[in-house]
From Swiss-Prot:
NCBIfam families listed in its UniProt record: PRK10678.1
Descriptive protein name: Molybdopterin synthase catalytic subunit
Keywords per UniProt: Isopeptide bond, Molybdenum cofactor biosynthesis, Transferase
Gene that encodes the chain: moaE
Family of this protein: Belongs to the MoaE family.
InterPro entries reported for this sequence: MoaE_sf (IPR036563), Mopterin_biosynth_MoaE (IPR003448)
Effect annotated for changing residue 115 to A: 4-fold lower activity than wild-type
Induction: By anaerobiosis, repressed by the molybdenum cofactor.
Subunit organization: Heterotetramer of 2 MoaD subunits and 2 MoaE subunits. Also stable as homodimer. The enzyme changes between these two forms during catalysis.
Documented EC number(s): 2.8.1.12
Annotated source species: Escherichia coli (strain K12)
Molecular function terms, GO-annotated: molybdopterin synthase activity; protein homodimerization activity
One GO BP: Mo-molybdopterin cofactor biosynthetic process
Length: 150
């Protein structure tokens, strides 16, 4: 039975606490995880903090649709998507994606697909605090290109 966990909120998460739920199914031979962190730099500038905003309800729906699309493309077991919001600092974890499948290729591809689509289709907005002031982070062309390959 396929199971999905989607969480959007300000609370920190623990990769060590998320992994056991992903790994407990004996029918899954592969567990792939990705964790994204706040960098201390972007576009050549120092980043002191990152504020993430979202559209409540719509964001969770968009993430569920992305996971459903991944499930339609690959035979997946469990999927976890966690995305933090609020003010974060360099080194803080922002996003966690965990995917299980019977085989590694499906798990790797689905995890990458989910991240590529999350970056381009989920309604999140980022504002960076730099020494020169705050600025909104615009979508990257490289993220759009990554999503197009699917």
């Amino acid at each position: 039975m396929a199971e999905t966990k989607i969480v959007v909120g300000p609370q920190p998460f623990s990769v060590g606490e998320e992994y056991p739920w992903l790994a407990e199914r004996d029918e899954d031979g592969a567990v792939v995880t990705f964790t994204g962190k706040v960098r201390n730099h972007n576009l050549g500038d120092s980043v002191n903090a990152l504020t993430l905003e979202h559209y409540p309800g719509m964001t969770e729906k968009a993430l569920a649709e992305i996971v459903d699309e991944a499930r339609n493309r690959w035979p997946l077991g469990r999927v976890t998507v966690i995305h933090r919001i609020g003010e974060l600092w360099p080194g803080d974890e922002i996003v966690f994606v965990g995917v299980t499948s019977a085989h590694r290729s499906s798990a790797f591809e689905a995890g990458q697909f989910i991240m590529d689509y999350l970056k381009t289709r989920a309604p999140f907005w980022k504002r960076e605090a730099t020494p020169e002031g705050d600025r909104w982070v615009e979508a990257r062309e490289s993220d759009q290109q990554a999503a197009k390959r699917w």
